[in-house]
Each structure stands twice: as structure tokens, then as C-alpha cells.
């Protein structure tokens, strides 16, 4: 019923959407419904953290996306607020044609950031990743410029914001200003249980605060999980107090399996696949771990015993936002002969003409020379992002260079399909797999820690979840929870 109510609701909307609940589907459906009802000149903006997510929204909307802003959070404030109105807010000494490469232009204070922009023509960034200069600047411009406020107010009737749990404090402040001062309706969706990026500035407290305290939003909870089978849903919900009421106990658990850690990992896998036959070795099978060295060790041990596992590493680009997806597509094009310029173009938000695609190809082809260097990489990225009118972060340049200058991460850009893979939990966020193995000792849920990481890990599994029970405190905690909740069946031991 909530989904139908969301579509009909004309107010500010806050949606908490658990793993596999179809949050992108409801976001797109709501956009389509609002645009169909809209008989005015107003448009909508749909913003998210990555170009990949924006591209997915744009693709699902199809023709409906035309005339509306579909892109990243950074792209929205830069193209709709900062560039058009910085002169009106701060004077003609401030450039609107600033460059987007930051390099060493990091600073500690807002005033220093303004000086870098004014005198060096560069939109810089704070040295502290938990502070967001671009969003502080955009909010300052709105407060100083009547024209900017009038423009945003007269153009947008609603702004849709994805993955709100990953917003930082400065993003939150700007979005609340749009709602409170400009009276623009907001549709925000997220899941605090999936916030695993606090280390890079995300503040799930912003989202939680709105859930608990705000009276300006009509609040909805999407609890149906269309990804995971019921056994896996029950198990993942057990460890979060707010989701325990969603557990639907079954008479028999078949798809969440506990196995003791009393033998090598290769023997555990043989027991699961051959002796007990609870896993299908001919189907997709993924092992999720917390640390890179742990993944490499497991891969070596398994492959020495005749298995064929590939570790898909989290690359430095996975820690660089918001353009990590686009930069990874560029590397695929450079390092993989099977990946064409048209594959890359398909991942760029917006409809590119044949001429634009050829111009982009010409820029990127400079990276195909045998001996690339830092200077060449810098220049190519500057030219590419200038062409696409996207801001480039110095951390992204550093990460891109690190990946390009070594073969260490090449497997992450291989377009071949591998059945048996090992991921870290952070690199697996947003993905889903048929069969998943996790290790209990990776998660200190019994100390009320790692609960978000545990939730993300368990909800990557669609059909089968295996827990290697190598931590007695973890298993004791499960028993305690089962007794408290009077649950008899949550995991099957073999």
C-alpha cells in the first residue's frame, strides 16, 4: 500500500528503503507520476552520488528525462547555482569559467577557498574530507543572490535525492534550505543501515534526524525485499532492532547455513558443494571479506586446491567520489580491447552525439601510448572533464593515476564474467549474487559494531547465504537474540 500512497502523495516525502526493496523503481515511478501531473513550466531535478546511478535513473525515465536535471549532487550545484550566479553573489572578480581540477589546491578555511577561486580560477576543496566547500559555496550564493533564488524557485517544483544516508552535513544544509526557504518539495530516499561511508564525510545522522524529528515530511518505509529469499531476509533483519519485526519465521531454514571453522577453507567449500550439496559450484559463488590481504590469502589457498576464484579488488577509484564510475569506464576502455568507446559513452549521463563521442575518443586515446606519465594523465583528465563539464577532484586524479600506472587492479576492469569471485564488503555494495559466503569473525555485531557492514554483506545474497562460524561470541549473540525474540529457526547448522 505504501507504494501507491507515495505515488499519490503531493508533499515532501521521506522514504526509508531497505536492501532489495526497489528504491530506484519507486523513485523513477514517482518522477514519472509527478511529471505526468505537472501542467506548468516547472521541472524536476533527480540527484544522486554517482554518474552510474544517475545514468540508471535517466535510462529508466527515457524520454521523460528531457528538460529535467538528472545527474550528480555535485553536478547540480555547480551547473545550476555556482557557475550561473557566482558573479551576482560575489562580484565580477569571481570567475564563472573556473576549472575543475583541484590538484594541490586544498585548504582549511572557507575564506581561503574563495581566494583560490578568485585568484587562481580554480574551484578547490577542503583538506578535511568531511567538509564540503562546493555545497557551502552554493548555499552562500543562494543566500546572497536574489536572482539565484528566483531562478531555482521558478525552475524546479521538486528535487529527488537518492542515497540520502550518504549525504554530508553541507549537502544536508543546502537541501534543507531549498525546502525551508525556497519552498521546493523534496523526495528523499535512503537506508541508514547501508551507510558505510562515514569515513569520507557521510553523516547518516542527518537522515536519522529527519526520520525521528522532522514534521515536514510524509514518511514511508519500504520493507519488502525483492532480492533476497525469506531465509536471508530473516537473518539480515535479526541484527537490526528496527527490522526485527519484519522477521517471518519459517518451520525450516534451508538457505542460511552455518558451518564450523574446524578445517581449511578449501575443505569447507568441498563439504558445502560435494558432501552436503548446499552450494552449487557450477553457479555464481562469491566470498565477502573485510580486508584485501584476507581476500588474497583465501584466493591463493582455494586455487592451490584446484578451485578457480578471482579476487575483484576495491580500487583506489572506489574510494573517490563522485566520478569514480566514469573514471573506471575510461580505464576499461584503455585497458580492455573488448570495451569500445560506445560502451563508455553509454555510461555517460546525457545523450551524446556522434561528433561528441568522437571528440571524447580523441581525448582518451592519448592514454593508449606505451609509456604514459603523470603529466599526460593530468592533461587528458582535465580535457575530458572540461568537455563533459564535470568537476574533477584531486583525489580522483590521484586514484586514477595509481590505477593506470600499475597492473595490480587490472582484473577489476576485465569484462569477462567469472563465476567464483572474492570481494571486500565495501566494493560489493550495490551488487547482488546468487550464493554468498561470509565469515562471522569479520563482524563485531555482538558489540553493536559493524552492523551496517553486516547488513550490506548478508543482503548481497539472493538465494543462499553461508556463515563460517569462527567466532563464538557471534554465535552466542545469535542464540541470545533468538531467545529474546522467541525464534526457533533462523540459521541451519551443518
UniProtKB/Swiss-Prot annotation:
Enumerate the residues marked as the site Interaction with GajA: 147, 150
Q: Which residues bind ATP?
A: 17-24
> What is the protein's name according to its record?
Gabija protein GajB
Phenotypic consequence of gene deletion: When this gene is missing the Gabija type I system does not confer resistance to SpBeta in B.subtilis. When this gene is missing the Gabija type I system does not confer resistance to T7 in E.coli.
- Function per UniProt: Component of antiviral defense system Gabija type I, composed of GajA and GajB. Expression of Gabija type I in B.subtilis (strain BEST7003) confers resistance to phages phi105, phi29, rho14, SpBeta and SBSphiC. Expression of Gabija type I in E.coli B (strain ATCC 11303) confers resistance to phage T7. May be a helicase or contribute to GajA activation.
**What region holds the UvrD-like helicase ATP-binding domain?**
1-229
Which UniProt keyword terms apply here? Antiviral defense, ATP-binding, Helicase, Host-virus interaction, Hydrolase, Nucleotide-binding
Answer yes or no on keyword Metal-binding.
no
